[in-house]
């Protein structure tokens, strides 16, 4: 099911890039191979692909993912089951230096910090 969804989203991203639009994927690309697919789509459309990696301690990430979704309008699917969180984090492939990620400290996310990180 997830493969079909991401294949569909990749097709949409490809078409948007062909049409000269910008695309932002706000999701967890835990695997290098998935990020490589997006880089290829971008490259095929003469677009830039940039990985933004938000880093936090695993215990804080667990708390954010599994608690209090009802208090956040961005968490429309609710809390992630702890078992799903553990599966995802245990299989995580952080980006390598050759991917040139922009690394964001997830404990410092303020407007000023983000502007500084992205040079805005």
Give the positions of each predicted feature:
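Amphipathic alpha-helical transducer elements in NTP-driven molecular machines
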Residues: 2-10, 55, 82-89
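Short glycine-/polar-rich loops that comprise or flank the Walker A/P-loop
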Residues: 19, 45-50, 97-101
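Conserved phosphate-donor/acceptor-positioning beta-strand/loop module used by diverse small-molecule
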Residues: 44-65
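Small-molecule kinase domains that catalyze NTP-dependent phosphoryl transfer to phosphate-bearing small molecules
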Residues: 72-115
């Amino acid at each position: 099911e997830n493969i079909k969804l991401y294949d569909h989203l990749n097709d949409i991203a490809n078409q948007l890039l062909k049409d000269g639009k910008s695309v932002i994927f706000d999701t967890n690309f835990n695997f290098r191979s998935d990020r490589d697919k997006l880089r290829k789509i971008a490259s095929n459309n003469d677009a830039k692909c940039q990985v933004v990696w938000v880093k936090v301690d695993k215990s804080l990430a667990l708390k954010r993912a599994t608690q209090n979704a009802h208090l956040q309008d961005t968490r429309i699917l609710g809390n992630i089951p702890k078992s799903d969180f553990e599966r995802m984090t245990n299989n995580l492939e952080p980006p390598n230096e050759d991917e040139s990620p922009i690394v964001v400290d997830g404990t410092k996310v303020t407007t000023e910090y983000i502007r500084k990180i992205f040079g805005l």
